[in-house]
Amino acid sequence: MANDQNYHYFDRYSLVHGALAVVLQASKVPAVPAMLGHVAFEMVEDGVKRKVKSIWPDSRPDAIQNHVGDIVSFNAGYVASHALSKSPPGKVALTGFVMLAAGVWIWNLLQHHSWLSPLQETGTGAIRR
């Protein structure tokens, strides 16, 4: 459905795209293959979301705006990681950023999948198990 798409250039998952770039840069994956791989992923992401909804906190399809924002976030994360990884304080900052992004992903996954969370809202403000 067109109205159910994510039309935002940047959202909380932009952190996750940036953090993935940090991990790849720290793993010594060269910039061009990493960035091209991410563009390729963005091209198939919606299809993967449709087939494997359980691992996505938000399985709505992305509009072109969001794909562009994800690519920008990834590239910015890679460039920032390259610059910051040269110093111990930079490495600490990058580690914290990756941990924050992982927390965002896990928190949203727990919030959107009732099979992970024993507590569910009933729609009346009450919570049931």
Functional labels for PLM-detected ranges:
Residues M1-I64, V68, V72-R129:
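Bulky hydrophobic segments
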